[in-house]
Swiss-Prot record:
FMN binds at residues 68-71, 99, 128, 194, 224, 277-279, 298-299. Its EC number is 5.3.3.2. This is Isopentenyl-diphosphate delta-isomerase. Homooctamer. Dimer of tetramers. Its main location: cytoplasm. It is found in: Cytoplasm. Mg(2+) binds at residue 163. Keywords: Cytoplasm, Flavoprotein, FMN, Isomerase, Isoprene biosynthesis, Magnesium, Metal-binding, NADP. It comes from Methanoregula boonei (strain DSM 21154 / JCM 14090 / 6A8).
Length: 359
């Protein structure tokens, strides 16, 4: 049978959604256990009046919780995207969609993405295109991705570990930073450069800022492992499939832990989205104290999004309660006050941060 690239890309998106929902795809330690916020025994603020609102790329959001890129590109993903969008609209959150490549290859799938603007007419929405696809198709594809969801910004994702271990992976990264720079110069909306689970170093952050990126989403190691996802996806019936499965398992530990990546990137510029293994409002508070502007969650929201609007809303409310309580106990009445919250960093995370900052 002839290889059908359009159908294959769409099928892969459904595979990813199913695997993330059904399998154990989290790997590693993002470093939050090594971060301890200093308790403020006299917080001098009213917990009931704590303000979670924040500004990001010229937009006011009701909370720093960002619904991270997850899905789209197959008819079976439309309902989840619609539910996530309704929650983003209801709670005043920013939201990113999954890679729009499938819908750009096959416009019949565009409604699996455009539904987010239908359901969230006022939300801050972020389009999504891979760096390789940007290099191959240029700003024209980026423009189509933006138009598809009426996006307020576009994320260019870096997923070269995933590409390296999937059978249909794009194996050349040559020219991607130049393509990002060209897009930043041409587009009228902000460009966000995002990793997808391996983190961003200070060196790469500086390349992104120099290229004109408006923000960086660190996508650190310690949350959903796309190496693990591809390992589950690999066909184990033949030698190549077994080899790819082993490769995915071997690289499950590859990457920069989220806390370390956040510290590195926040020291080079802003704004920064922290993501990768953030599982609670307490983790969010730690990220804000470390310099994050927004905190992205994907897997913790995907699972309730596959259940019901009520389950998803309950999860968001719990996260917000945890964040408010954490801020109160740090004496922070507003999000910007968390920048002044003291914290201790211990263990392996401290060691990695110290090793990355030689005297």
């Amino acid at each position: 049978m002839a290889y059908n690239k359009k159908r294959f890309t769409s099928s892969r998106k459904l595979d990813h959604l199913r695997i993330c929902a059904e399998e154990e795809v989290e790997s590693g330690d993002a470093g939050f256990g090594d971060v301890r916020l200093v308790h403020h025994a006299l917080p001098e603020c009213d917990m009931r009046s704590i303000d979670l609102s924040t500004r990001f790329l010229g937009h006011t959001l009701s909370s720093p919780l960002f619904v991270s890129a997850m899905t789209g590109g197959h008819p079976g993903t439309k309902d989840a995207n619609a539910r996530l969008a309704r929650i983003a609209e209801r709670f005043g959150l920013g939201m990113g969609v999954g890679s729009q490549r499938a819908a750009l290859e096959n416009p019949a799938l565009a409604d699996t993405f455009s539904v987010v603007r239908d359901e969230a007419p006022h939300a801050f929405l972020v389009a999504n295109l891979g760096a390789v696809q940007l290099r191959e198709h240029g700003a024209a594809w980026a423009g189509q991705a933006i138009e598809m969801i009426g996006a307020n910004a576009i994320a260019i994702h870096l997923n070269f570990l995933q590409e390296a271990i999937q059978p249909e992976g794009d194996l050349s990264a040559t020219g991607c930073i130049a393509a990002i720079a060209d897009l930043c110069a041409e587009t009228k909306i902000p460009v966000i450069v995002k990793e997808t689970g391996c983190g961003i170093s200070r060196e790469v952050a500086r390349l992104c800022w120099s290229a004109g990126a408006a923000a960086i989403d660190i996508g650190g190691w310690g949350g959903t492992s796309w190496a693990a996802v591809e390992s589950f996806r690999a066909d184990r019936k033949d030698a190549q499939g077994r080899a790819l499965k082993t490769l995915g398992e071997d690289f499950a530990g590859w990457g920069i832990p989220t806390v370390v990546s956040l510290a590195e990137v926040a020291g080079t510029g802003s704004p920064v989205i922290a993501s990768g293994g953030i599982r609670s409002g307490i983790d969010m508070a730690k990220c804000l104290a470390l310099g994050a502007d927004l905190c992205g969650m994907a897997l913790p929201l995907l699972k309730p999004a596959l259940e019901s609007d009520e389950a998803l809303a309950a999860r968001v409310e719990t996260i917000h309660r945890e964040l408010v309580a954490s801020m109160f106990l740090c004496g922070a009445a507003r999000i910007r006050d968390m920048r002044r919250a003291r914290l201790f960093i211990t263990g392996r995370t401290r060691q990695m941060m110290d090793d990355g900052n030689p005297a």
